[in-house]
Amino acid sequence: PNILPGDQYVVFEIKGWKCGILICYDNNIIENVRATALLGADIIFMPHVTMCTPSPRPGAGLINPVLWENRANDPTSLRQEFDGLKGRAWLMKWLPARAYDNAVYVVFSNPIGRDYNEIKNGCSMILDPFGDIVAECRKLGDDFVIATAIPEKLRQAGGYRYRNARRPELYADIIGQPHESNQKVAWLTETTNSK
């Protein structure tokens, strides 16, 4: 695929809201979300093609395609796989924290169904600056949700206070140290992984 890691942060405006976008793996590096929030993003769009993939993480792995093909007859078995550690349970370990810690709205999208030789579990959702899910796609098929973003939540959320309480003089030299990125993700080639 012609997919490469991003090399800059982007904040743009939509109808008065400052928005950022971090694609898939970029969201796994917590500093990316913080940097985008510090650039003024109120909403961060997070398009993904993730979950239900091979991984050394306990409980991770592929979904048996038979479960997807049989979803009309046995939705419960598929839902258990989709919501377990291969999918939603893993997502809930980190995604709400990105919204909460940075006091931003998060618009997370992920496909459902066949993606080449893998089955994806969807779980597209919108989270508020408190890290609470305000809308989520739960159908075992195509779905979409909408939500109303409330500007006041941006400053009411704990993450807003914590961002303002930061003391970069304590850790700027630590966080800013030179570091060679080693991104070990399946879809990157060896050439790209070593950049």
Q: Whereabouts are the PLM-identified features?
A:
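Short gly/ser/thr-rich secondary-structure transition/capping motifs
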Residues: 2-3, 89
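CN hydrolase (nitrilase-like) catalytic-core segments centered on the catalytic cysteine
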Residues: 18, 27-144
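Charge-rich, low-complexity amphipathic helices
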Residues: 58-59, 63-67, 120-121, 128, ...
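Short secondary-structure boundary motifs at beta->alpha junctions and helix caps
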Residues: 143, 151-154
